[in-house]
Amino acid sequence: MAAGVFKSFMRDFFAVKYDEQRNDPQAERLDGNGRLYPNCSSDVWLRSCEREIVDPIEGHHSGHIPKWICGSLLRNGPGSWKVGDMTFGHLFDCSALLHRFAIRNGRVTYQNRFVDTETLRKNRSAQRIVVTEFGTAAVPDPCHSIFDRFAAIFRPDSGTDNSMISIYPFGDQYYTFTETPFMHRINPCTLATEARICTTDFVGVVNHTSHPHVLPSGTVYNLGTTMTRSGPAYTILSFPHGEQMFEDAHVVATLPCRWKLHPGYMHTFGLTDHYFVIVEQPLSVSLTEYIKAQLGGQNLSACLKWFEDRPTLFHLIDRVSGKLVQTYESEAFFYLHIINCFERDGHVVVDICSYRNPEMINCMYLEAIANMQTNPNYATLFRGRPLRFVLPLGTIPPASIAKRGLVKSFSLAGLSAPQVSRTMKHSVSQYADITYMPTNGKQATAGEESPKRDAKRGRYEEENLVNLVTMEGSQAEAFQGTNGIQLRPEMLCDWGCETPRIYYERYMGKNYRYFYAISSDVDAVNPGTLIKVDVWNKSCLTWCEENVYPSEPIFVPSPDPKSEDDGVILASMVLGGLNDRYVGLIVLCAKTMTELGRCDFHTNGPVPKCLHGWFAPNAI
């Protein structure tokens, strides 16, 4: 374990009190002095909703919004940093706020509403933070002894139910998600919270990801963690389509975690026609630190451990038998979102928005966001790239080895190249040099000497390694190593991509061509860029507008689509700077990424930037 790589995760972030005058990012922007990222307005993440908009409001329309679009774009994300005179420490702690853009006959209305969680009620009643979150420790309750705190470890309902990350459908109902076992059913038309579900009541898991997969049949799969006699294990949960999806939930596959005291941190998982794909990164939740945090009143981020010298594992599990088929490994990397997975020509392809390490999570602390303009490392810490890993299936016949290409090196160190000068100071972490090594498919400078093998970083400089990837057109590599098959990815595009979306209903788990994302490069010319990536030819189309910060782009297909990108992109928008009482909806042609129409709303209070959402057809 590398000391210092995850240092800020170990801080006791006890309900930080935020000095708005001292840390106001708008002050430097207005002065025009000392801003390292002059095109990026971090304040869009620091806003708090002061007044809900329960009743839909009308906006100003421009352009042409196709009349065939009928439904509601539902959004979820951080709604408020404040409770009384206290402030949360991390973006993931903020109270969940829902947004709704109702679209019908070319017209749009907007409303927002907080998710009515138990956590929100408790905090508002006490007028202080009384439930511990990811980056914020609760105010100690003097009535609770150490024995009470110990007993709470084994009660699922003692943790936060702040479901502020995503929204997914279960049948004709919609639920908000977080990474605890709680979800909330919401009304897609009024945004009212109708019920709370605890997955633990139906299947024995202690948590689950905030990104389940919804099949065309209506069945939902999710990945959870359970405790067994032999230690923690990952479990694939099935919620069969029907009137009792939760009551009928069951486990279809179980995989032991590689470390008994350190289950991996899981934000999502993958699915193909025949396999579940579990990507086990070396970011783990320390069970011993979790107990210490519960007893000592620390925030939950204190439990995370990053093992930089351990590989990332790719597990393929048979969807029929639930058995492990094969495990592959690559150099350590961090990720939140898998773009898509699919099978092709005897391979499983896994596309991931990848980072060299988990430092980007630290970038979302309140203090880090507020001070980003004076942090020369911020852009590097947040830098990631979409990578493609190709996993060869089956055994490799000896006779075919001579026909395969040779692998010259193996490294993930070339994850990205910065869009700023190479003289820029980098992170003091182990991976501060991620910008100088080539990623496969990105050629090194002529005469540049490759670094020698470094076992701690997982690099390989052995000659004559046999490339096991035979998929036509792929630049990804795999080879037989001493511990199994080693993977080396190819880069899909040289943009930082986050919150990726595809034509989900038709291409989830299938061979696809396009995905859509928002830019994660804070040092870009326009950080608020929407990106369309063609993974076949690795080309990009973009849309951006100065000082506009769009949300995750949602693809909505045309009524009778003739191609994968025949449809529109829907994204909400906020503005950087002083205009925090604005929110809008942009509608783009998915083929060309050009604007079709928009609707602008002026609200009665600040509107924060959101995270994830879902288009609910006919929810009008």
UniProtKB/Swiss-Prot annotation:
Domain of life: Eukaryota
Catalytically driven reaction(s): all-trans-zeaxanthin + O2 = (3R)-11-cis-3-hydroxyretinal + (3R)-all-trans-3-hydroxyretinal
E.C. designation(s): 1.13.11.65
UniProt pathway annotation: Cofactor metabolism; retinol metabolism
UniProt cross-references to InterPro entries, sorted A to Z: Carotenoid_Oase
Residues bound to Fe cation: H211, H267, H337, H612
Impact when changing M471L: In ninaB(P315); no effect
GO BP annotations, alphabetical order: carotene catabolic process; carotene metabolic process; phototransduction; phototransduction, UV; phototransduction, visible light; retinal metabolic process; retinol metabolic process; rhodopsin biosynthetic process
Alphabetical UniProt keywords: Iron, Metal-binding, Monooxygenase, Oxidoreductase
Organ and tissue specificity: Expression follows organogenesis of the larval Bolwig's organ (BO), which mediates larval photophobic behavior. In the adult, expression is restricted exclusively to the brain. Expressed in both neuronal cells and glia cells. Not active within photoreceptors. Active within neuronal cells within the central nervous system.
GO molecular function terms attached to this record: beta-carotene 15,15'-dioxygenase activity; carotenoid dioxygenase activity; carotenoid isomerooxygenase activity; metal ion binding; monooxygenase activity
Bias kind Basic and acidic residues: ranges: 449-459
Needed co-factor(s): Fe(2+)
Cofactor-binding details, from the entry: Binds 1 Fe(2+) ion per subunit.
Region of interest: Disordered: 440-459
Family, similarity comment: Belongs to the carotenoid oxygenase family.
Its job: Catalyzes the oxidative cleavage at the 15,15'-double bond of carotenoids and the simultaneous all-trans to 11-cis isomerization of one cleavage product. Carotenoids like 11-cis retinal can promote visual pigment biogenesis in the dark. Essential for the biosynthesis of the 3-hydroxyretinal chromophore of rhodopsin from zeaxanthin and for proper photoreceptor development. Also essential for larval light perception.
Protein name, UniProt field: Carotenoid isomerooxygenase
Organism: Drosophila melanogaster
